[in-house]
């Protein structure tokens, strides 16, 4: 069955806009499958690392994609049935994932792999390119946005809870720079699809943001 036959919700937006949390919770409410494209690159990076491949061995990596199984369950990510949620956050894996994401041939190879997550009863997919490249025919496209100030406050709160005392002004500078880089990058820049519904969730809770999306579905 093709992804066009399955109700698909694609969510994009800048870093820190809450698209990951919203997408996960939305998939639970709808009982849909869930795809986190960022985690996909990390898991593939881990699989490449485990197989001792180089990221530029594209043919071998494409073959590897046919062999591995990636799945998501609530806040956990699995590779061939093993919980790798912590492993994929390691610095070495993050760096390799970034290299893979910048390799256009590998990005193209990953298209069909990502689209294979579209299964009945439906899919909630979040991440870069979801609305424009991976699922251009998605039934519902969401661009989740929030101001730099709002995203800085959220990030500051997260870091404080982890015991890290950081300057919120520095966070604002970092996030603004990340936005600029994401929008100006040559490959896969951050874009707002013409068909996307823009939701600014400044001051909104996760539940309130999800309710706005559910209203669009209904």
Annotate each PLM feature.
Residues 9-11:
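Hydrophobic anchor at the beta1->P-loop junction of P-loop NTPases
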Residues 14-17:
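ATP-binding Walker
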């Amino acid at each position: 069955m093709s992804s066009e036959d399955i109700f698909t919700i694609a969510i994009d937006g800048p870093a820190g806009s809450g698209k990951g949390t919203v997408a996960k919770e939305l998939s639970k409410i709808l009982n849909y499958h869930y795809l986190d494209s960022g985690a996909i690159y990390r898991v593939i990076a881990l699989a490449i690392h485990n197989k001792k491949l180089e990221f530029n061995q594209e043919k071998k990596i494409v073959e590897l994609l046919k062999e591995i199984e990636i799945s998501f369950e609530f806040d956990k990510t699995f590779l061939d049935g093993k919980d790798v949620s912590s492993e994929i956050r390691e610095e070495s894996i993050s760096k390799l994932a970034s290299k893979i994401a910048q390799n256009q041939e590998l990005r193209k190879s990953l298209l069909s792999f990502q689209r294979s997550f579209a299964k009945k009863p439906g899919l909630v997919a979040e991440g870069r390119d979801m609305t424009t490249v991976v699922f251009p025919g998605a039934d519902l496209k969401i661009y989740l946005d929030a101001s730099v100030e709002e995203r800085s406050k959220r990030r500051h709160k997260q870091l404080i809870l982890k015991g890290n005392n950081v300057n919120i002004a520095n966070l604002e500078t970092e996030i603004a720079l990340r936005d600029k880089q994401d929008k100006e990058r040559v490959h896969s820049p951050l874009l707002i699809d013409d068909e996307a519904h823009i939701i600014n969730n400044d001051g909104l809770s996760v539940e309130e943001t999800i309710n706005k999306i559910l209203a669009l579905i209904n």
